[in-house]
Amino acid sequence: MTDIKSMNLTEMAAYFKELGEPAFRAKQVFQWLHRGVFSFDEMTNLSKPLREKLAASCILYAPQVERRQVSALDGTIKYLWRLRDGNCIETVLMRYHHGNTVCISSQVGCRMGCAFCASTLGGKVRDLTPAEMLDQVLFTQMDSGAPVSNIVLMGIGEPLDNFDTVLRFLELVNSPDGLNIGMRHISLSTCGLTEKIDKLADYQLQLTLSVSLHAPDDETRSRIMPVNRSVGVEKLFAACRRYFEKTGRRISYEYAMIDGVNDADWQADLLARHLKGTPGHVNLIPLNNVEESPLKPSRRVAAFQKRLESHGITATVRRKLGGDIDASCGQLRRKTMQQEHT
């Protein structure tokens, strides 16, 4: 079966040529798919024989809403989707004054092993396809009735560990014949795969790269983020500098504030030294509690921010959304998995 929704327009045109159909059919089907149509029968400008041919040869699967949580505080919606193979992923819709942002997953599970993240518990199961990533945006938009203006790849999984798929997804959502979401409205988060950061820089995409840093020194970062053991903080910051030089895009550094682990003044001072001379922004994140983790939220967020700012570093505190639901990454999926195995 052909995964037609993962195709770009050029590939789709070639596919229709193989079927003996005119190339313009590809654009018609592409536009239907990117409007959120999940049945060839709904594509009313196609002939019935062609619709039947496509239905017999192509995968077109709508993800099922396993659970939906809506925050009474701010309207944030957390979705748990059931995929066609039975696996589950999460998507979060966040409402801001500037528009609606959807946070999507790039993998089923994650193999990065970060100590403070629920999505890595149980490891990585598999990569998502471009279609499965796109469906999160389309279905969230359809279900909520909220048009999506911004996308963040900060859900379950390490996007750069699924590099080619993520690039294709970015191409699809950026297409003028699809959702046409501009690259400057897309953020991609990585825990710091330096070779992939360099590879991404070569494409010179105008998206925002968000580096999940969480500690400025190797001892601390290696303890809470195993990926650092093979990379190191110096190599990571060097890759970030190269990325900025190639793309001209300022990097956002994500920093989850953990009590007694990464919130000391000396760590703020060290972080500031790393960032001197390279435009960047530090996003301080109040830690979400994970039941299986002993790590606790820091009470020094404001002090840490002030310390960074005293060095001339731009630092903000992430607004916490969905505080009354399982809105942080991997929590809802983890709870569902535990329930299914009891």
Label each region the model flagged.
Residues 1-89, 241-250, 255-342:
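Auxiliary Fe-S-binding modules of radical SAM enzymes
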Residues 28, 107, 133-136, 305:
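Glutamine-centric residue-chemistry signal
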Residues 35-36, 119-124, 217-218, 287-291:
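A short, flexible beta-alpha/helix-coil linker loop
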Residues 77, 89, 100-104, 112, ...:
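Generic beta-strand structural signal
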Residues 85-99:
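P-loop NTP-binding catalytic core
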Residues 95-132:
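Canonical Radical SAM [4Fe-4S] cluster-binding loop centered on the CxxxCxxC motif
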Residues 121-150:
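Conserved alpha-helical substructure of the radical SAM core
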Residues 141-150, 155-311, 315:
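Conserved AdoMet/S-adenosylmethionine-binding subsite of the radical SAM
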